Structure formats: structure tokens, C-alpha cells
């Protein structure tokens, strides 16, 4: 068959366990192609973290290959109504069919639940495709006798399960990790991720080490699941399936790493917040390229040492990362020094309003919470091989949703 490169709309939102109105979904998701409203992307990929609900059988038939619907949770039998799916579906054109809806996690825990067993919602991946795209995938599957979709769940969290329930092993709770879908017809692996967060009083290098350990587990799980579907064998699976990593990867900005500077509203927070309050986009872009930890890690891996001033600044031996992690991270960040938005986290929930709709330079009137240093944990990373075939037409953040301490992000690729 002729090689097929569908246009992509990729989006991510950490929902903070809250719902979303149809108007907000319309504004956010209609960035599918803001300049050509009648030319919609072929694939719509939506990553959600701390999503308040998970998919259920009302979405469609789960027995067939498309749509693929799955939830990994101890509470599947007592789920609340899934308003999120209906909100998103109603915001899209009738040209779209549901391709996959996969989630893992637990519903948001009630207030007062101890932190060691408290859940904030599900990690979720929802994929819609235009009808002719689905037809292409079906034709490919029949010709090559391959599955249309390969779902992968990779829990990496440390939460304790609910009492008397042990559906997941120790240190593999589904509050952190990735839900993934590989599409053999396109040779792509889409991962919706939520990695380890940050606590005060410790430098980011400590948490980066945890995040890279989590990425290694995710990469290993993906390799095992994909090895029999790639002609190059287990050690090459993540080279054959080109990664699209999207979600709350939780890498942060850090100027002052000393523990005494990491307190709530402390020196590190103030140094970053002062730049943001000036409202100068050039200064914000310089802040991103100089102090965003993920930007530095990816630069170091790409340029063999350039990024951090010293490898010790990274907090881990990047050269010693397993090959599968390096394969997973052969990606291009859609946020670059020249198009990055103002930080997407951490805002005061429910306060302020946006001063512009969506653009690379949009700045919210919402205040950043002193709880954490303002950062760009929400990211869209696309395989470098794919970026040679795709142009990133636009990317940005939607500051109109105030129900979460994050704002949604998006990228349009064609």
C-alpha cells in the first residue's frame, strides 16, 4: 500500500479531577485547524490526566478491533457516568469515529483520604479518526493480517490500593505511568503519560531520576508488547514504532536547586514568577531554554553533552540510559525556545480569566500558585522521524479553562 501520513491534532490536559464544559471543549478542540475550518485533522489524539471518569461499554462494542475500549481500575463496576467522552464527542465533527478509549487509575478519592492511597483520577487516551482514515487502517490490517491497534498499559505508581483490593502489583499502581496505543498501519506508538510529581524542599534532579526510571519501565513494557509485531525484534521495537509522547511528564523549571530555596513561595518560585509577571515573551522563552529540565535533558541527549553545563547538573548519567529509553526519547518537543507559551502550571484553581484565546504568546491573568515553581510539565513530543514528514502548523495553550491548576495544550501537524 502507498505510505499514508494522516494529519494530526494532539492535545493534553491535566484535569485535576474536574469536568469540562462543552464550550471549553469546543474552543480547545476546534484548534484542530483554526485557519481551515473545513479541513480537519485525520487523527485527533487526546491525552488526559487526573480525568474524573473512565470509558465504559456505552461507547461502543468492545469485542471488535475498532473502537478499542478498556479501563484498568479496581472500581470499574461502580464508575460514574462518563461525561468526558460525551463532551469531547459532541465537540467534534460527525466525520469522526472513535478509534480507541483507554484508561487506568481510580476515580478521585474523597477529601481526607491519606496521601499514600489518594487518587486524583485516571490517565486516559482517546483517539478519534476520520471515516476515510479508519477505512485505510482496516484495509492495511486485512492486507498485512495485522491488528489495527495494539493497546499497552504501563502503571508505574507507588500508591497503596484500596482496602481488600489488589488488582495491581506493588509499586505498579495506575496513578502514574502510561496508557498507549500502537497503530501498525502507521508505525506509530502513542503514549498518554503522567509521571512522578515534585515535592517541596528537594532539588529537581531527585525527581528527574524517578521520572527516567518510570520512562524505562514504560519503554520496557512497550518493547515486550510490540516485539512480535516488528520485523526487527525486541531490541528494535521502539525504533520501528515511532513514538508520540503526550501528557503531564512533570519535568519542571529550576533556577535554584538548594533545598532551602525550594520552599513554598521561596527563592526558586520568586525568581521564575518575577520573569512571568514582567510579561515579556522574549524573557519567558529564554527562561524556558535555560532552565526547563526536559528541554535540557533532550538537548543533552541529542547533542551528546550540550544542554546542561555539566552532566552532574542532570542528576543522572544520561549517557548510561538504556537504549530503549533513548529510542523512546528520539523526539522533537513541539515547544521550542521560539514558540513556547507561558508556563502551563501551577495556577490557582478557579481564579482569573484569560486575556486572549489561544496563541503561542497568550498570557493568562491567572496567578501562579506559590505551591510549586511555575513550569511546563505538559508536553507533546513527536518522533524526529515523524517530524521530517510533518510540519507543526501551530501549537499553544488554552488559558480559558480555570477548573484545574494546569491549562490544556495542543499541536496541529500536517
State each model region's role.
Residues 16, 51-52, 194-196, 249-252:
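Catalytic metal-binding/acid-base residues of hydrolase active sites
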Residues 10, 46, 128, 181, ...:
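Structural signal for hydrophobic/aromatic residues that build the beta-strand cores
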Residues 168-186, 196-198, 211, 220-224:
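Extended serine/threonine-enriched, polar tracts that run as long, contiguous segments within proteins
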Residues 1-10, 121-125, 129-138, 150-153, ...:
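Beta-strand-turn-beta hairpins that frame and shape the catalytic cleft
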Residues 1-126, 158-164, 201-211, 215, ...:
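N-terminal, active-site-proximal structural segment of metallo-dependent hydrolase catalytic domains
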Amino acid at each position: 500500500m502507498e505510505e499514508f501520513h494522516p494529519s494530526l491534532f494532539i492535545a493534553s490536559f491535566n484535569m485535576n479531577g474536574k469536568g469540562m464544559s462543552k464550550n471549553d471543549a469546543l474552543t480547545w478542540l476546534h484548534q484542530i485547524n483554526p485557519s481551515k475550518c473545513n479541513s480537519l485533522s485525520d487523527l485527533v489524539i487526546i491525552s488526559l490526566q487526573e480525568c474524573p471518569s473512565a470509558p465504559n461499554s456505552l461507547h461502543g462494542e468492545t469485542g471488535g478491533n475498532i473502537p478499542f475500549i478498556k479501563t484498568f481500575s479496581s472500581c470499574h463496576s461502580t464508575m460514574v457516568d462518563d461525561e468526558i467522552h460525551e463532551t469531547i464527542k459532541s465537540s467534534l465533527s460527525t466525520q469522526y469515529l472513535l478509534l480507541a478509549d483507554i484508561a487506568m487509575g481510580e476515580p478521585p478519592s474523597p477529601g481526607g483520604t491519606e496521601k499514600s492511597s489518594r487518587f486524583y483520577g485516571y490517565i486516559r487516551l482517546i483517539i478519534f479518526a476520520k471515516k476515510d482514515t479508519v477505512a485505510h487502517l482496516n484495509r492495511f490490517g486485512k492486507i498485512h493480517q495485522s491488528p489495527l491497534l495494539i493497546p499497552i498499559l504501563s502503571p508505574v505508581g507507588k500508591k497503596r490500593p484500596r482496602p481488600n483490593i489488589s488488582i495491581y502489583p506493588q509499586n505498579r499502581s495506575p496513578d502514574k505511568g502510561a496508557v498507549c496505543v500502537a497503530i501498525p498501519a502507521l508505525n506509530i506508538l502513542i503514549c498518554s503519560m503522567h509521571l512522578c510529581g515534585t515535592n517541596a524542599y528537594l532539588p529537581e534532579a531527585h525527581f528527574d531520576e524517578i521520572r527516567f526510571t518510570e520512562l524505562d519501565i514504560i519503554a520496557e513494557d512497550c518493547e515486550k508488547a510490540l516485539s512480535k509485531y516488528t520485523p526487527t525484534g525486541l531490541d528494535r521495537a521502539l525504533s520501528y514504532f515511532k513514538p508520540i509522547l503526550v501528557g503531564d511528564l512533570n519535568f519542571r523549571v529550576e533556577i535554584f536547586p538548594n533545598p532551602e530555596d525550594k520552599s513554598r513561595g521561596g527563592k526558586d518560585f520568586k525568581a521564575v514568577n518575577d520573569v512571568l509577571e514582567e510579561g515579556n515573551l522574549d524573557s519567558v522563552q529564554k527562561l524556558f531554554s535555560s532552565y526547563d529540565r526536559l528541554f535540557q535533558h533532550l538537548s543533552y541527549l541529542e547533542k551528546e553533552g550540550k544542554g546542561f553545563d555539566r552532566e552532574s547538573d542532570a542528576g543522572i548519567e544520561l549517557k548510561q540510559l538504556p537504549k530503549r529509553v533513548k529510542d523512546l526519547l528520539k523526539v522533537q518537543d513541539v515547544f521550542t525556545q521560539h514558540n513556547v507559551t507561558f508556563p502551563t502550571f501551577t495556577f490557582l484553581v478557579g481564579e482569573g480569566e484569560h486575556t486572549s484565546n489561544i496563541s503561542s504568546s497568550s498570557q493568562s491573568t491567572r496567578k501562579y500558585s506559590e505551591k510549586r515553581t511555575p513550569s511546563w510539565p505538559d508536553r507533546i513530543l513527536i518522533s524526529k522521524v515523524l517530524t521530517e514528514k510533518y510540519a507543526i502548523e501551530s501549537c499553544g495553550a488554552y488559558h480559558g479553562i480555570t477548573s484545574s491548576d494546569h491549562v490544556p495544550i495542543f499541536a496541529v501537524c500536517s
